[in-house]
């Protein structure tokens, strides 16, 4: 028996207005009440979670939230324009768990300023937040992005395939051995990515 969920991925769902979130959630919630689907999954940023938002998510049948944690190293967060402290991530995780919502974390390895050690320490810190599931994404340089500019200027060095595989292996193993189900490794290719 597979679970049937509606998913809002590919953006920061809780970054849109509460009113618009409610409209989307209410629409889907009607299908939950009719037994046609089991729940709602979504992804968002840790700094777009607060009590009011989580209460609304729970009210309308959200069963799983994946946070784009990326890193728990302050230097890496700053270098990637994530201007919030690690405590914000911890608080978002805690709040979701308190409301009984499955917690997913998305980690990126090889970001600007990241090292093997900082990526591994991020995974160790993430374990303290008790995620249920995780995704691990090696950083990709995509055309027409700030990261591509940094790469072309020699300000960022992408991981080699071998480095990315080895780093991912270490983090995957750490998470799985500690009871976190890693549900994806790597980015799902899309037409847009293939063109770039």
Could you tell me what each predicted segment is?
Residues 3-7:
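Low-complexity, highly charged intrinsically disordered N-terminal segments
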Residues 9-12, 186-188:
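Short loop/turn segments at strand-loop or loop-helix junctions that form parts
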Residues 2, 146, 153-196:
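Auxiliary Fe-S-binding modules of radical SAM enzymes
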Residues 10-163:
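Conserved non-cysteine loop/helix-boundary elements of the Radical SAM core domain that shape
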């Amino acid at each position: 028996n597979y679970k049937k969920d509606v998913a809002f991925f590919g953006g920061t769902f809780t970054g849109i207005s509460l009113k618009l979130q409610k409209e989307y959630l209410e629409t889907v919630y009607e299908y939950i009440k009719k037994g046609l689907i089991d729940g709602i999954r979504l992804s968002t940023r840790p700094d777009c979670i607060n009590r009011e938002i989580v209460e609304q998510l729970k009210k309308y049948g959200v069963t799983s939230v994946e946070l784009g944690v990326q890193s728990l190293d302050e230097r890496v967060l700053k270098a990637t324009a994530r201007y919030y402290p690690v405590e914000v991530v911890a608080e978002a995780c805690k709040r979701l768990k308190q409301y009984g919502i499955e917690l997913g974390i998305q980690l990126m390895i090889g970001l600007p300023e990241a090292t093997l050690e900082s990526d591994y320490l991020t995974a160790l810190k993430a374990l303290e937040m008790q995620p249920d599931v995780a995704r691990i994404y090696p950083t990709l340089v995509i055309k027409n992005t700030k990261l591509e500019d940094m790469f072309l200027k020699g300000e960022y060095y992408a991981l080699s395939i071998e480095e990315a595989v080895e780093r991912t292996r270490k983090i995957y193993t750490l998470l799985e051995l500690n009871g976190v189900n890693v549900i994806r490794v790597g980015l799902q290719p899309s037409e847009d990515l293939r063109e770039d």
